[in-house]
């Protein structure tokens, strides 16, 4: 039986374990924490990730706990619609609590025979598949490094590459759902260099994210400053969102970005944030991890030479993640670094982006990857309902 070591038990690590174990590999997962858990609030899963979860036999289990969104809207601070996109089977978006997703993945991985070792931090990794775990040596034919944006493996193998970090961060929080979120619609409000997203993620809870530049101390503070956010988003203030969020436990994270010189070296592959951490502006953090780990399992399971298989995997598929990273950063730039003197022009840009099917198909290429068949599907003819851009009197 072929054997693999997976370093990390987040979405990428557990997905890699499921994909490999389902193809007959013996898999050991090493997690540095005392438990397998996910810190955060909600997480969006799009078509590429949903197809992987279906292949894992998890889609029905996930559906019981998630919200299937039917529409995505971008609005200015007063609630005027800048962009509106209907969501359906050809471009689906689901929202689920991160912890529930992790539990489902963990259960499936262990059902398939993967073994999880907690309190097992990785000290060092070698090209030949040897891994030092708290001073003890273990080895495998394949090592999958899913150890996050600050990856020990990436650094140890000399795969770090300098990259300009995003200048934004987000507070993520779960709040009680109210009548204002009765519909299964994700809404994102823009005001200057701030953004607030609101999306139902269970029948009783809403996932909200509050985005601000890192140098905005009041915007990055937790618990959130109700008055600060309410003054900049009057529509959401009227809905009582900030009062609800202020009493909940939110977590602030700087937007990540990783640019590795290579995803592979020897018998080691970087996956998830260790390979391609990116701002969450396109909702593809989980999707890329699920997609790339399943693709990786196809390559290493169909070839006897692991380094050769890993090189082919990266050659054939890295471009999707690269493009997604580029456009996720550009989308964040529109918020965090757009010149205030031309905010009215920004509204027109958002409107134009939403109106172009061809551009959306290019920017959102990751949504269309079917890792099961190893194909990129045709761009969906999703329904855009953009009206006219907001007037120059709105500063969005």
What name fits each language-model region?
Residues 12, 35, 150:
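Conserved Rossmann-like nucleotide-cofactor binding loop
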């Amino acid at each position: 039986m072929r054997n693999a070591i997976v370093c990390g038990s987040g979405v990428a690590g557990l997905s890699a374990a499921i994909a490999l174990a389902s193809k007959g590999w013996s898999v050991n997962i090493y997690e540095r924490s005392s438990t397998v858990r996910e810190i955060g609030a909600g997480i969006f899963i799009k078509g590429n990730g949903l197809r992987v979860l279906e292949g894992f036999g998890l889609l029905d289990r996930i559906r019981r706990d998630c919200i299937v969104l039917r529409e995505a809207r971008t609005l200015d601070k007063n609630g005027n619609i800048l962009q509106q996109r209907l969501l359906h089977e050809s471009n689906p978006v689901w929202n689920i609590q991160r912890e529930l997703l992790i539990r489902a993945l963990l259960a499936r991985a262990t059902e398939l025979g993967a073994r999880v070792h907690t309190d097992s931090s990785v000290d060092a990794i070698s090209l030949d598949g040897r891994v030092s775990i708290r001073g003890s040596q273990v080895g495998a034919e394949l090592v999958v490094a899913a150890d996050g944006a600050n990856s020990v493996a990436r650094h140890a193998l000399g795969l770090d590459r300098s990259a300009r970090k995003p200048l934004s961060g987000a507070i993520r929080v779960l709040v009680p759902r109210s009548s204002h979120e009765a519909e299964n619609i994700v809404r994102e409000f823009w005001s200057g260099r701030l953004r607030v997203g609101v999306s139902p993620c269970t029948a009783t809870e809403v996932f909200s994210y509050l985005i601000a530049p890192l140098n905005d101390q009041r915007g990055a503070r937790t618990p959130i400053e109700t008055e600060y956010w309410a003054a900049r988003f009057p529509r959401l203030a009227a809905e009582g969102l900030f009062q609800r969020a202020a009493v909940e436990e939110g977590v602030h994270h700087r937007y990540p970005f990783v640019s590795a010189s290579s995803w592979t070296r020897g018998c080691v592959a970087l996956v998830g944030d260790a390979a391609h951490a990116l701002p969450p502006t396109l909702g593809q953090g989980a999707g890329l991890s699920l997609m790339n780990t399943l693709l990786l399992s196809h390559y290493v399971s169909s070839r006897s030479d692991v380094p050769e298989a890993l090189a082919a995997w990266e050659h054939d598929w890295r471009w999707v993640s690269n493009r997604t990273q580029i456009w996720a950063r550009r989308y964040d730039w529109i918020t965090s670094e757009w010149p205030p003197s031309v905010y009215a022009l920004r509204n027109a840009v958002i409107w134009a982006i939403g109106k172009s099917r061809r551009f959306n198909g290019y920017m959102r290429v990751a949504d269309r990857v079917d890792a099961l068949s190893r194909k990129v599907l045709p761009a969906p003819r999703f329904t855009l309902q953009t009206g006219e851009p907001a007037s120059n009197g709105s500063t969005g």
